[in-house]
């Protein structure tokens, strides 16, 4: 899916640094180890480093501060954009290279704001650097044989051990489509699958009605109005575009 280019905001470094301080993320914005900063709910944020996702408690991070951060950044960006209940999703690129995705209600849960900031690399790397660090060792060779994971899944299917088949399919990160008639239990079955996603992964769900209440801690629920029934100018497509800027490990489209 090709994403529209995020608009470049015309903001001064001084203004941005002040806003980072108000939000309580200024230290993380300067960290060479952090590649992503994600705010899903008041009181905490998630940082992505080479070691994976890490939760940080931020008691001063309230809903009001998070929403005001979004409003201040977007309104002062000189891009002609506004973030409002009618247009609750905005993508921006900061002059200093960071890329941001902002989502406010009704496109996410009431009382929450989703802020995702992707930080550019602080160092330039050559192909020799990648070679020395073993980066290319993880590139799989083109194989004609069926992968071991798929052989295991085929064996489970032949044995009709479907509980283990689906459990393993989730752990092996296979794409799964759940379909059925209205009232056939699709959402309930989907929840049973999601239960097996590890807690250290970041999830983003996309729904037209809030039905997926999940236990994973690093999660954002995006909401769109089917048939233009809601107040927000949000579609499944715009949710997917926003989602791809939010660094999900898994996308759950309900």
What kind of feature is each model-predicted range?
Residues 155-159, 163-179, 192-254:
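Switch/coupling sub-region of P-loop NTPases
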Residues 37, 102, 251:
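Residue-level signature of catalytic and energy-coupling elements of molecular machines
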Residues 1-96:
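N-terminal accessory targeting/assembly segments
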Residues 50-51, 129, 215-218:
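Short acidic, glycine/serine/threonine-rich loops at helix termini
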Residues 183:
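Walker A (P-loop) phosphate-binding loop of P-loop NTPases
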Residues 54-71, 75-171:
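P-loop NTP-binding catalytic core
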Residues 186:
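Conserved lysine of the Walker
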